[in-house]
Regions:
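Short, well-structured N-terminal submotif of metal-dependent ribonuclease cores
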Residues: 1-36, 48-60
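Short, hinge-like loop/turn segments at secondary-structure boundaries
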Residues: 51-55, 87-88, 127-130
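Glycine/charged-rich beta-loop-alpha catalytic/anionic-binding loops adjacent to active sites
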Residues: 25-27, 61-63, 81-86
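Active-site neighborhoods of divalent-metal-dependent phosphate/nucleic-acid chemistry enzymes
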Residues: 68-111
Protein backbone atom coordinates (compact mmCIF):
# COMPACT_ATOMS: atom_id res chain seq x y z
CA UNK A 1 0.00 0.00 0.00
CA UNK A 2 1.20 3.50 -0.80
CA UNK A 3 0.92 6.56 1.39
CA UNK A 4 -2.37 8.41 1.55
CA UNK A 5 -3.56 11.64 3.16
CA UNK A 6 -6.31 11.88 5.78
CA UNK A 7 -8.38 14.97 6.40
CA UNK A 8 -9.65 15.88 9.86
CA UNK A 9 -13.13 14.43 9.22
CA UNK A 10 -11.69 11.03 8.35
CA UNK A 11 -9.34 11.00 11.32
CA UNK A 12 -12.25 11.86 13.62
CA UNK A 13 -14.44 9.18 12.04
CA UNK A 14 -11.68 6.65 12.60
CA UNK A 15 -11.04 7.70 16.22
CA UNK A 16 -14.78 7.68 17.02
CA UNK A 17 -15.37 4.45 15.01
CA UNK A 18 -18.08 6.10 12.92
CA UNK A 19 -19.75 4.63 9.84
CA UNK A 20 -17.60 4.78 6.73
CA UNK A 21 -14.27 3.86 8.29
CA UNK A 22 -14.73 0.34 6.96
CA UNK A 23 -14.09 1.75 3.46
CA UNK A 24 -10.60 2.82 4.53
CA UNK A 25 -7.50 0.63 4.60
CA UNK A 26 -7.10 -1.56 7.69
CA UNK A 27 -5.95 0.01 10.96
CA UNK A 28 -2.43 -1.38 10.69
CA UNK A 29 -2.12 0.19 7.25
CA UNK A 30 -3.38 3.54 8.54
CA UNK A 31 -0.71 3.57 11.22
CA UNK A 32 2.01 2.85 8.69
CA UNK A 33 0.91 4.80 5.64
CA UNK A 34 -1.28 7.77 6.59
CA UNK A 35 -0.09 11.35 6.38
CA UNK A 36 -1.96 14.33 7.80
CA UNK A 37 -1.23 18.03 7.62
CA UNK A 38 -0.46 19.69 10.94
CA UNK A 39 -3.38 22.03 10.14
CA UNK A 40 -5.81 19.10 9.97
CA UNK A 41 -4.32 17.56 13.09
CA UNK A 42 -5.04 20.80 14.98
CA UNK A 43 -8.56 20.84 13.54
CA UNK A 44 -9.30 17.29 14.70
CA UNK A 45 -7.79 17.98 18.12
CA UNK A 46 -9.92 21.12 18.50
CA UNK A 47 -13.13 19.26 17.68
CA UNK A 48 -12.50 16.60 20.33
CA UNK A 49 -11.60 19.22 22.95
CA UNK A 50 -14.80 21.14 22.10
CA UNK A 51 -16.76 17.94 22.80
CA UNK A 52 -15.38 17.97 26.35
CA UNK A 53 -12.51 15.52 25.99
CA UNK A 54 -9.49 16.70 28.01
CA UNK A 55 -6.84 18.16 25.70
CA UNK A 56 -4.16 15.57 26.51
CA UNK A 57 -6.58 12.66 26.05
CA UNK A 58 -7.82 14.12 22.77
CA UNK A 59 -4.24 14.52 21.56
CA UNK A 60 -3.38 10.91 22.38
CA UNK A 61 -6.53 9.68 20.62
CA UNK A 62 -5.78 11.49 17.36
CA UNK A 63 -2.08 10.72 17.33
CA UNK A 64 -2.54 6.95 17.79
CA UNK A 65 -3.60 6.10 14.20
CA UNK A 66 -1.33 8.57 12.40
CA UNK A 67 1.74 7.45 10.49
CA UNK A 68 3.22 10.87 9.70
CA UNK A 69 2.44 14.54 10.33
CA UNK A 70 3.41 16.98 7.58
CA UNK A 71 4.36 20.48 8.68
CA UNK A 72 2.42 23.30 7.05
CA UNK A 73 5.39 25.04 5.43
CA UNK A 74 5.51 28.02 3.02
CA UNK A 75 5.40 25.78 -0.08
CA UNK A 76 2.38 23.97 1.29
CA UNK A 77 0.75 27.31 2.21
CA UNK A 78 1.24 28.61 -1.34
CA UNK A 79 -0.35 25.51 -2.83
CA UNK A 80 -3.29 25.62 -0.38
CA UNK A 81 -3.86 29.31 -1.08
CA UNK A 82 -3.76 28.66 -4.80
CA UNK A 83 -6.61 26.15 -4.54
CA UNK A 84 -9.11 28.82 -3.47
CA UNK A 85 -10.47 29.44 -6.98
CA UNK A 86 -11.02 25.72 -7.61
CA UNK A 87 -12.71 25.10 -4.27
CA UNK A 88 -14.53 28.20 -3.05
CA UNK A 89 -17.77 27.34 -4.89
CA UNK A 90 -17.95 24.28 -2.63
CA UNK A 91 -17.23 26.25 0.55
CA UNK A 92 -13.99 24.44 1.39
CA UNK A 93 -12.07 25.79 4.38
CA UNK A 94 -8.38 26.52 4.71
CA UNK A 95 -8.06 23.18 6.52
CA UNK A 96 -9.68 21.40 3.59
CA UNK A 97 -7.34 23.12 1.15
CA UNK A 98 -4.32 22.30 3.34
CA UNK A 99 -5.29 18.64 3.17
CA UNK A 100 -5.81 18.70 -0.58
CA UNK A 101 -2.57 20.62 -1.11
CA UNK A 102 -0.66 17.97 0.82
CA UNK A 103 -2.20 15.16 -1.24
CA UNK A 104 -1.41 17.00 -4.48
CA UNK A 105 2.14 17.71 -3.33
CA UNK A 106 2.71 14.04 -2.45
CA UNK A 107 0.76 12.77 -5.46
CA UNK A 108 -1.28 10.38 -3.32
CA UNK A 109 -4.98 9.67 -2.65
CA UNK A 110 -6.88 11.54 0.04
CA UNK A 111 -9.63 10.22 2.32
CA UNK A 112 -12.43 12.50 3.52
CA UNK A 113 -15.88 12.27 5.06
CA UNK A 114 -16.93 15.46 3.23
CA UNK A 115 -19.14 14.36 0.32
CA UNK A 116 -18.75 17.67 -1.49
CA UNK A 117 -15.12 16.78 -2.25
CA UNK A 118 -16.37 14.21 -4.78
CA UNK A 119 -17.15 17.17 -7.06
CA UNK A 120 -13.46 18.13 -7.25
CA UNK A 121 -11.13 17.21 -10.09
CA UNK A 122 -7.63 18.03 -8.87
CA UNK A 123 -5.67 15.20 -10.43
CA UNK A 124 -5.58 13.03 -7.30
CA UNK A 125 -7.90 10.23 -6.17
CA UNK A 126 -10.41 11.51 -3.61
CA UNK A 127 -12.09 8.79 -1.53
CA UNK A 128 -15.26 9.82 0.30
CA UNK A 129 -15.75 7.39 3.17
CA UNK A 130 -19.52 7.81 3.53
Amino acid sequence: LSKFVLDASTLLAFVKEEPGVDTMPAESEIISFSVISSVNLAEAHSKLVMKGIPANDAWEAIMAPIGEVADFNPHHAKRAGGLILQTRHLGLSLGDRACLALAIELGVPVYTADRVWSQLDLGIPIHVIR
